[in-house]
Amino acid sequence: MWRLKIAEGGNDPYLYSTNNFVGRQTWEFDSEYGTPEAIKEVEEARQIFYKNRFQVKPCGDLLWRFQFLREKNFKQTIPQVKVGDGEEVTYEAASTTLKRSVNLLTALQADDGHWPAEIAGPQFFLPPLVFCLYITGHLNVVFNVHHREEILRSIYYHQNEDGGWGLHIEGHSTMFCTALNYICLRMLGVGPDEGDDNACPRARKWILDHGSVTHIPSWGKTWLSILGLFDWSGSNPMPPEFWILPTFMPMYPAKMWCYCRMVYMPMSYLYGKRFVGPITPLIKQLREELFSEPFEEIKWKKVRHLCAPEDLYYPHPLIQDLMWDSLYLFTEPLLTRWPFNNLIRQKALQVTMDHIHYEDENSRYITIGCVEKVLCMLACWVEDPNGVCYKKHLARVPDYIWIAEDGLKMQSFGSQQWDCGFAVQALLASNMSLDEIGPALKKGHFFIKESQVKDNPSGDFKSMHRHISKGSWTFSDQDHGWQVSDCTAEGLKCCLILSTMPPEIVGEKMDPERLYDSVNVLLSLQSENGGLSAWEPAGAQAWLELLNPTEFFADIVIEHEYVECTGASIQALVLFKKMYPGHRKKEIENFIAKAAKYLEDTQYPNGSWYGNWGVCFTYGTWFALGGLAAAGKTYANCAAMRKGVEFLLKSQKEDGGWGESYVSCPKKDFVPLEGPSNLTQTAWALMGLIYARQMERDPTPLHQAAKLLINSQLENGDFPQQEITGVFMKNCMLHYPMYRTIYPLWAIAEYRTHVPLRLS
């Protein structure tokens, strides 16, 4: 039976940590673990998911929850409450629902203080890991028979009815993910005419019906070239010389968004090497299965710009195709011939590899995310198949593996700090006695303090295109090392609030100098327009987005400002200013004023704000209203607050909640959800209205939303898993299963505190 292990590093000599692996999550299969009842519970969860897989596509992330609740002998002892038709929500009903949620949330906390959770959803994360291990010969070493069973389960369970796979689990089928998952099935031993529900024949038919893999997007062309299923001449150039450009060039790496930089860094190394994996009998078979014409007869030069319409979200502008053509026709032939291949190309490859090693070391071989992880790992193997760097990469593969009732997934990377910050704030908002929530707050406080990044990247980090990180929080854990502004804001808020509480109950408060370091990071990430970027200062020329080489993402070339990062940072710095009024007072006041102005300036005409990391306008509006309220803006003195409230009230559904389709994100236009409300989005909207003091004008919409949340609570105190609610880069969704547990609790807590309720 599968078992989640927390904060363990084992005795692997290739594994090291900055904080004794606090926050690390790894799964192992233990044949001795689990009673017959526990095994039956897991199998029933799998069957229920499979039966309903086309109705609710995100999993409930139940395996670790079953494990934790079983190990803690959790029993929900408080009876469920329902508010009947025509009845008012009473203080007692809200309190009972809240306490039941808190009981469950505290039981789900790990011993190191964080709340484990899946963070997956995209269907192009896992296949490249399988490809890499297949090439290096470690597929059977890393993935045993139990892993393989779960990988196949995940692929089968998320195959669309038309035979393809979407960019993410709720998306329409795409060439990119259908081809990648088909190849993955074949590498795991599934025959071309095999697979559950004829998975392989159906997928192959979809691929061939849509033009064959010659129409795969550029990232797919790269992976197929690496595998020997494409010729490198069928891909647009990715010259490693990019890494030795002079600083005045518009495309200088330091001006790029960090994820764009980190993906194309190992890609350019592999491209520059023209690396191709071993041409095995399986690769030769796949050459016959995936194309509509003989492999040897394909005119590779003509397929470079092909992309299936199902994959095309960002069509390349003409100027970009002209740039690729120039590089392809003139630059590459020059750089790959003597003497330039020795004078320039070899130097560029070495500089690129130096950057890869630097990033690997500074993230403890986790890297910035899963797409980059696999590419960097493969680059290290290509450089030295028996080298220490590749072995260190292998040791961190388990950090990315997640298992739920719908099988094995590759995480984007962990969301430990992100989820923990919100869970702690939800518990604090509950206003329950410290006897009840004190132990959970103490553990959460410990995790947050342990997870703060204590140092900047090593050495001359600016020459390696890195920004300060000392004092920040990452999205996952301290070992990851990458600062994020909103994660830093949420961590700072938690530490500030907990510092006002008895240390014997919630733990010792954080040293003020470490709080000052956090403030320094936030101040450094504000742009001239007042907005906050996420990872590094924004400021590169906007026209560089015309060179976005991906077809299925938008706004990936340069760093941008984000509503959520801005709103969260205002809240954190307003709180900090109250508690430390003498520290950088003028800078912080200017920061808050500029940030509030940015929120006012970026409001949509309908009163909403676009959410970059959650679905979508509901999410962005929650953060914006929270930031504006913290900055002193009110419904009476701020038109943006009034318009934001109007947007939320107009979009409230008949059942009292809110529901927004993920399609809002790529369309950049509010698209209501068909059917019932989404409870996570309802919680966001409810809290947004409370920030704007809606209860002082007309509390009815708040009562309606709270009633829906209360009546939707499950027997164990949780809330049902519904539609996917996370997003990145406009077009790809992320599944955050802890959201359904945290946000309804938090919203009910704020509702009970701020909205006058009748006593029964």
UniProtKB/Swiss-Prot annotation:
Gene Ontology CC terms, in alphabetical order: lipid droplet
Tissue specificity note: Highly expressed in flowers and flower buds, to a lower extent in young leaves, and present in old leaves, stems and roots.
Gene3D superfamilies: 1.50.10.20
Source taxonomy: Eukaryota, Viridiplantae, Streptophyta, Embryophyta, Tracheophyta
Swiss-Prot/TrEMBL PFTB repeat ranges: 98-140, 148-189, 441-485, 515-556, 592-632, 641-683, 702-743
Underlying gene: bAS1
Role summary: Component of the oleanane-type triterpene saponins (e.g. saponarioside A and saponarioside B) biosynthetic pathway, leading to the production of natural products with detergent properties used as traditional sources of soap. Oxidosqualene cyclase mediating the conversion of oxidosqualene to beta-amyrin, generating five rings and eight asymmetric centers in a single transformation.
Applications: Soapwort saponins possess anticancer properties and are also being explored as enhancers for endosomal escape in targeted tumor therapies. They may also serve as precursors for vaccine adjuvants.
Single GO BP term: saponin biosynthetic process
Family designation: Belongs to the terpene cyclase/mutase family.
Pathway: Secondary metabolite biosynthesis; terpenoid biosynthesis
UniProt cross-references to PANTHER family, sorted A to Z: BETA-AMYRIN SYNTHASE-RELATED (PTHR11764:SF58), TERPENE CYCLASE/MUTASE FAMILY MEMBER (PTHR11764)
SUPFAM superfamilies: Terpenoid cyclases/Protein prenyltransferases (SSF48239)
Catalytic activity entry: (S)-2,3-epoxysqualene = beta-amyrin
Name of the protein this chain belongs to: Beta-amyrin synthase 1
Record organism: Saponaria officinalis (Common soapwort)
Residues annotated as catalytic: D486
Pfam families, sorted: SQHop_cyclase_C, SQHop_cyclase_N
Single GO molecular function: beta-amyrin synthase activity
